[in-house]
Amino acid sequence: MAQQIEAPRRVPLSRGRVLRAGVALADSTGIESLSMRKLAEELGVVPMALYKHVGNKEELLDGMIDVVVGEIDPPVRGTDWKSAIRQRILSARRALLRHPWASHVIESRTNPTPDLLEYLDSMIGIFRAGGFSIDLTHHVMHAIGSRLLGFTQELFDDSQSVDPEMQAIVVRELAKKYPYVAEIAGAASHEGESVVGQGCDDQFEFEFALDLLLDGFERLRHQELTHRPGSQRTQQASR
């Protein structure tokens, strides 16, 4: 008697599966080519099936951002505020480097997503637990800006690859009128996988600026603590 072969069971569609597939599709083809129709084809369903789990493309994008934010490492217990903030920001950066489209989608959102709000709330909590006042925390959150999520808005986009010979010609022309700009533009390239363009190690520059900010925040925190009413230095000064 011939043995019947069972057909493989179809994985049921769920919101999580839809969002993860959206992230994978954006990673492989780019966020510009993402559509509900293409995502449905990728999942082997009709487009209408997606709308049971995401109301529209905007809700899909919000959910995809939450998937990326979910990849950020949780806070490390027992560390000082500076180490905790630095570790999470660099983890956020690694997540965004895995999904290059995510920073543009985050910037396009008019309201933060639930997981993004949870991340921001956690980061604010680290500052507050580290001794920052509400006012100082407010200021440092503005100062650190999008670095909190692992990316920066650059003055000029140098992410496109440039032919070295053409780059040299451009630098020589710049030097005739803008010598200091040319000096920076012609700086020697850094080594490593994070090099962007011809003269900028993006990861190094990101961490350089981040550490400058964190060191500055620590000085402000110390000043605030020593001048706060009830502190030992304030009491000594009032005698």
Regions found by a protein language model. Give the residues of each.
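N-terminal intrinsically disordered/low-complexity leader segments
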Residues: M1-L13, D73, E183-S194, L225-R239
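A hydrophobic membrane-anchoring alpha-helix module
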Residues: Q198-G230
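C-terminal lobe substrate-recognition/regulatory segment of protein kinase catalytic domains
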Residues: M166-C200
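Basic, helix-initiating cap at the start of DNA-binding domains
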Residues: M1-K38, E42-V45, V54-D62
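Hydrophobic alpha-helical connector segments
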Residues: D73-E118, I134-T137, M141-I144
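Alpha-helical structural segments
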Residues: R17-A24, E59-P75, A84-S91, E118, ...
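Hydrophobic alpha-helical bundle segments that form small-molecule/ligand-binding pockets
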Residues: Y119-V170, A187, F217-L220
